[in-house]
């Protein structure tokens, strides 16, 4: 598996982070997991921190057990080992971050950024664009340059109102020097209503529908074609 020349390095592993909580990381992650699975790929999900709800969403979307990566509760060696062990037979490994990218228990210690650097994987930044347009440029620029050891490989915008809105956001990415990988349109059906979701049969059916809709959105506005940087070659299918 490889993404040579894609801007994501030689490994089809990356972390999905965000500037803040409630940016749409989980919705995008679920959609991407299912979209890649629907393409016949083995996708291994992970979650930063001890969260057990998001890992359940990941499993529903990917068909594989999602694994917690936590540098507060476990050693760096343990985190590296389980990341490698669970992803050994996968075509792509996707780590969903927690809170804002640099938010940890002591500055950025224990943060999603720390885990991305520990595993030496790039970050896809999800930005909530609900009430903003070109002003995302300095935000993206800041995330790109705040820590030179961390690679921000691209941006996906969430809560985009229209193609015209996306045009402003795409220009902001270009001026900040970070690739724009796509967007998800504003859609109330793509909002996870509560942390209880998925704990009952009825709620699981609702979650499955949300995953299906998110995957459709990701396929149409992020992946778009088989050669997209987020999609590694399918074994034997080139």
Where are these regions (language model features)?
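Short, electropositive, low-hydrophobicity segments enriched in small/polar residues
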Residues: 28, 67, 101-104, 186, ...
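Short hydrophobic alpha-helical runs that function as membrane-insertion/retention elements
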Residues: 123-126, 181-183
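Internal gly/pro-rich beta-alpha loop/helix module
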Residues: 134-227
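ATP-dependent carboxylate-amine ligase catalytic core
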Residues: 9-23, 27, 33-119, 127-154, ...
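Short conserved micro-motifs on helix faces and helix-strand junctions that flank
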Residues: 21-23, 176, 230-233
């Amino acid at each position: 598996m490889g993404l040579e020349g894609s801007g994501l390095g030689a490994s089809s592993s990356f972390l999905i982070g965000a500037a803040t909580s409630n940016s749409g990381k989980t919705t995008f992650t679920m959609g991407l997991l299912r979209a890649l699975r629907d393409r016949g790929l083995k996708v291994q999900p992970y979650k930063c921190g001890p969260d057990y709800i998001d890992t359940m969403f990941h499993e529903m979307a990917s068909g594989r057990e999602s694994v917690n990566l936590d540098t507060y509760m476990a050693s760096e060696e343990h985190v590296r080992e389980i990341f490698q062990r669970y992803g050994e037979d996968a075509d792509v490994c996707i780590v969903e971050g927690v809170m804002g990218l640099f938010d940890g228990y002591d500055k950025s210690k224990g943060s999603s950024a720390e885990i991305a650097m520990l595993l030496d994987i790039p970050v896809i930044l999800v930005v909530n664009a609900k009430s903003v347009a070109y002003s995302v440029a300095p935000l993206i620029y800041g995330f790109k340059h705040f820590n030179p050891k961390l690679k921000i490989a691209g941006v996906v915008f969430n809560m985009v109102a229209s193609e015209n809105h996306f045009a402003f956001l795409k220009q902001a990415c270009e001026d900040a020097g970070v690739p724009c990988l796509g967007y998800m349109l504003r859609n109330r059906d793509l909002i996870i209503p509560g942390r209880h979701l998925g704990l009952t049969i009825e709620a699981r059916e609702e979650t499955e529908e949300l995953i299906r809709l998110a995957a459709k959105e990701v396929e149409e506005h992020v992946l778009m074609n088989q050669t997209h940087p987020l999609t590694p070659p399918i074994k034997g299918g080139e």
